[in-house]
Amino acid sequence: MTLQGKTIFMSGGSRGIGLEIAKRFAADGANIAIAAKTASPHPKLSGTIYTASKEIEGLGGKALPIVCDIRNEEAVDNAISSCVKQFGGIDICINNASAVSPTPTTLTPMKRYDLMNEVNARGTFMLSQKCHPHLKKA
């Protein structure tokens, strides 16, 4: 199976495993929308949606960098609309965005837990729900 011309909507993806997945799909000629908050470099982590897009395009894929916080329903709606407008639909949804805490449970502040829950559970559910109508058409 080839991903040539298929459109992937990915949350996260500006670095780490998400970027590696996107690069693999780019090598097949896929269209990849990278929806993440990383428009500017993080002081401790390399990569932005723009640097990821350059890497994707350098490997033969088409990229659409979208600034998006997947906790925000309006931002997700707008990101999906931008992807559909640019590429004509969505064939694959990859929920890659995540928030983690390297601390033991007893030392994890509730504010950090709330962030992890909003991104990892709610954001994943919402993105899947919002992509579903497009995936059914694919």
Predicted segments, located by residue:
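The beta1-alpha1 cofactor-binding region of Rossmann-like NAD(H)/NADP(H)-dependent oxidoreductases
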Residues: 47, 67-79, 110
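Conserved glycine-rich Rossmann-like NAD(P)H-binding loop of the short-chain dehydrogenase/reductase
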Residues: 28-51
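A glycine-rich helix->loop->beta "capping" turn
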Residues: 59-62, 82-95, 101
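Active-site loop of short-chain dehydrogenase/reductase
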Residues: 6, 61-62, 89-90, 135-138
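A short, exposed helix-loop element centered on a Lys and neighboring polar residues
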Residues: 128-129
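Substrate-binding pocket helix/loop in short-chain dehydrogenase/reductase
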Residues: 104-114
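Conserved glycine-rich cofactor-binding loop
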Residues: 7, 14-15
